[in-house]
């Protein structure tokens, strides 16, 4: 819970940064708060163990000789060093089967047995590709374990030999080496950059061709995801430049698994900062990425929404590239998607558009998305309501008076005020700031807005917030009461009624200036 508060505080600090600094109003992806943004998808793990389908079955037909209960590690280690090729291959195969057939493979036991150097030596045996394959497979599964277990493989000097095996004439050996390297790269930025420094990218990308079997290409794409993953630090710029052309090819692939991983790779790159966002934009891939927001597979939609969502955390210019691809036309479906997590991510995306310039705010209005945001503000699950509160509050900073007046016309005040009673202090602050901003912008129409707030029970909620434990909240609640609700003469003064707009809707006096200070505390 403390981590959530810390992240939310940072988010709020960024949001309120130095007046109308629109770039800092854009909010980076918050992996702890937004569950959708956590990667706990089986097909997208950092590390993967190679377990043959037949080994998953309980009544596996593994020969009894290789079953754990009938196989002593000591004998396996001894036989793995045998000069007899048949005995050696059987022993290495036995080790591999121990590592791939068990739900809880005895990785530590095998490491302690001293077999690692023997397996690594087997990788050098060009005269025996079957032995290379079995040894690579065993090492792949050791590297699929904890960080310490992966490090044991790295420290045994296996990586240069795996890179060498990428050039093996035997495809199964190549593929197993790719898998092993994927597990090592997936351990973290240090391992990633170490493998990159040894030259993994060019041979890896050379496998991408029409003739490659689909299972092999899936593995290659998954390794590319791991190369793009992690942003502390992000991958080297030259690596990104090498990988992007391949992603531009793979984004047209018909295989869903390959497409999903390609788009996740883009989402990781765009999560690293504006410089990386610009590299992705310059690759020309965005026009091919945006249509995936309406892909029939939810997995593809989710990844695409994340990737474009990251791009719009960038500058106004970078955001405009996404909008120019007709991105907003996909959002009515995303905002009404049966999966709440998609709704939440979609509103988060839009909150970064409403943090943009006035033309971008207008684009959201013109796409008829504001009523849908307000509906989710009212009826969505709490995570979605929270994102909607940010979207509305951002609009009160970025928008023109007529754009903020449009919020009032769409009846934003009641659902906005309803969030004043939630336990999440950041949401309460964001709503109070939005209300304060609307009231300040209304100027001589503030009385009418105040009446709307009072009629829906908002005034009572604001009064109660004067006793809130959070200093910022009770001060702002007091200021709102003091500035806009302290007068007793709430009569129908004609001068306080908003000027008429078509259809008798609200309008603010356009001669007054938009406040430039942003949210004030």
Curated annotation (Swiss-Prot):
UniProt subunit comment: Forms a complex with importin subunit beta-1 (KPNB1). Interacts with SNAI1. Interacts with TALDO1 isoform 1. Interacts with CYB1.
Major localization listed first in the record, in broad terms: cytoplasm
Domain of life: Eukaryota
Protein name according to UniProt: Importin subunit alpha-3
ARM repeats: 66-106, 107-149, 150-194, 195-233, 234-278, 279-318, 319-360, 361-400, 401-443, 447-485
UniProt region (NLS binding site (minor)), positions on chain: 306-394
PANTHER family, sorted: IMPORTIN ALPHA
The encoding gene: Kpna4
Organism: Mus musculus (Mouse)
């Amino acid at each position: 819970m403390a981590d959530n508060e810390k992240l939310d505080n940072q988010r709020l600090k960024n949001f309120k940064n130095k007046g109308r600094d629109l770039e800092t109003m854009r909010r980076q992806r918050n992996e702890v708060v937004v569950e959708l943004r956590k990667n706990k998808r089986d097909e997208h793990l950092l590390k993967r163990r190679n377990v043959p389908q037949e080994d998953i079955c309980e009544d596996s037909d593994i020969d009894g000789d290789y079953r754990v209960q009938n196989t002593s590690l000591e004998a396996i280690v001894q036989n793995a060093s045998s000069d007899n090729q048949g005995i050696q291959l059987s022993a290495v195969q036995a080790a591999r089967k121990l590592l791939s057939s068990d739900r809880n493979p005895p990785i530590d036991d095998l490491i302690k047995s001293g077999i690692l150097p023997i397996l690594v030596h087997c990788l050098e045996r060009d005269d025996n590709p079957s032995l290379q394959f079995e040894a690579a497979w065993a090492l792949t599964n050791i590297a699929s374990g904890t960080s310490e277990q992966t490090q044991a493989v790295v420290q045994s000097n296996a990586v240069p030999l795996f890179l060498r095996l990428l050039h093996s004439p035997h495809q199964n050996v190549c593929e197993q080496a790719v898998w092993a390297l994927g597990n090592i790269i997936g351990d973290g930025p240090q391992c990633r950059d170490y493998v990159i420094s040894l030259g993994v990218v060019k041979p890896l990308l050379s496998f991408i061709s029409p003739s490659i079997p689909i299972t092999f290409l899936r593995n290659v794409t998954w390794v590319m995801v791991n190369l793009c993953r992690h942003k502390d630090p992000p991958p080297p710029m030259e690596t990104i430049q090498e990988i992007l052309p391949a992603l531009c090819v793979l984004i047209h692939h018909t295989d869903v698994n390959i497409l999903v991983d390609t788009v996740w790779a883009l989402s990781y790159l765009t999560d690293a900062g504006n410089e990386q966002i610009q590299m992705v934009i310059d690759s020309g891939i965005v026009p091919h990425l945006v249509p995936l927001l309406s892909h029939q597979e939810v997995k593809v939609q989710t990844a695409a929404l994340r990737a474009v969502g990251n791009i719009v955390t960038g500058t106004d210019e970078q955001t405009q590239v996404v909008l120019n691809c007709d991105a907003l036309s996909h959002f009515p479906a995303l905002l009404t998607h049966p999966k709440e997590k998609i709704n939440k991510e979609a509103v988060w995306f839009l909150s970064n558009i409403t943090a943009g310039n006035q033309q971008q705010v207008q684009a959201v209005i013109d796409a008829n998305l504001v009523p849908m945001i307000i509906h989710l503000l009212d009826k969505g699950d709490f995570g979605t309501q929270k994102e909607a509160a940010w979207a509305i509050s951002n609009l009160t900073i970025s928008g023109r008076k007529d754009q903020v007046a449009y919020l009032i016309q769409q009846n934003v005040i009641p659902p906005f005020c309803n969030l004043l009673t939630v336990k999440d202090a950041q949401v309460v602050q964001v709503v109070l700031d939005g209300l304060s901003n609307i009231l300040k912008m209304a100027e001589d129409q503030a009385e009418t807005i105040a009446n709307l707030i009072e009629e829906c029970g908002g005034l009572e909620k604001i009064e109660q917030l004067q006793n809130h434990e959070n200093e910022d909240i009770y001060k702002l609640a007091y200021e709102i009461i003091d500035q806009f609700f302290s007068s007793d003469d709430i009569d129908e003064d004609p001068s306080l009624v908003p000027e008429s707009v078509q259809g008798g809707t609200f309008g603010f006096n356009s001669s007054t200036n938009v406040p430039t200070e942003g949210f004030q505390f």
